[in-house]
Amino acid sequence: GGGGGNVSGSYREAGGNMQPGAYGSYNYTGMDLSISRTAAPTYGGDNSFPGQESSRFRANQNCPLSTPDPLPCAKSQKSELSPADPATSSAHFTETEETSASSETDESTPRSGAPPRALQDNCSPGAAGTDGQSPQIFPWMRKLHINHDMAGPDGKRARTAYTRYQTLELEKEFHFNRYLTRRRRIEIAHTLCLSERQIKIWFQNRRMKWKKDNKLKSMSLATGSSAFQP
């Protein structure tokens, strides 16, 4: 009985000792003061922490400016400019060689053809001088001169071979006018590419034929009328 009382008394004393100590350590005013005191330095530490973070953030912002690596867009441009396939680059190189070779051949051909042009230019002033001295010659006049110079086997001038179109036009004109004026003769000569002399001779021959035909008709009519007379 006495031992149990001592144990309970010691337990109470221990409990009594623990309660004031716990109460003193966990005093409300002490807790508030301790929290406020401990919070002040921790809050100051918290105030200093954003400064460190801001300095780190600024350092991180300054890092891309100091990096020597080029921008990704420049890398992409370089990759686009660089040929992806060596076969395509070789094909492009061969095409440039072919085009350069063709341009060289094109340039060489005019150079080779240049001397004949120069010779023609040298010959042209002489021809121009001769043309300037001689009167102007039209194509139809040149053809007429050739026809006049041509001679037959007997030494006579060759007959002019009129085309069907020329003969038809001359027949039309003769049907309306048996005698031509000089102005009309020149117009017909230019139209049919003939000379005035050829037009004049053709009309003379056509009139002679017409007179001969009329004479034969008149003679036939006279003989016919005399035959019907009693």
UniProtKB/Swiss-Prot annotation:
Disulfide bonds: none annotated. Residues 155-214 bind DNA. Its main location: nucleus. This is Homeobox protein Hox-B5. It comes from Xenopus laevis. Sequence-specific transcription factor which is part of a developmental regulatory system that provides cells with specific positional identities on the anterior-posterior axis. Residues 49-65 have a biased composition (Polar residues). PROSITE patterns: ANTENNAPEDIA, HOMEOBOX_1, HOMEOBOX_2. Residues 87-103 have a biased composition (Low complexity). GO terms for cellular component: nucleoplasm. A motif (Antp-type hexapeptide) lies at residues 137-142. PANTHER family: HOMEOBOX C5, HOMEOTIC PROTEIN DEFORMED. InterPro entries: Antp_homeobox_Deformed_sf (IPR050609), HD (IPR001356), HD_metazoa (IPR020479), Homeobox_antennapedia (IPR017995), Homeobox_Antennapedia_CS (IPR001827), Homeobox_CS (IPR017970), Homeodomain-like_sf (IPR009057). Pfam families: Homeodomain. Belongs to the Antp homeobox family. The gene is hoxb5. One of its GO terms (molecular function) is RNA polymerase II cis-regulatory region sequence-specific DNA binding.
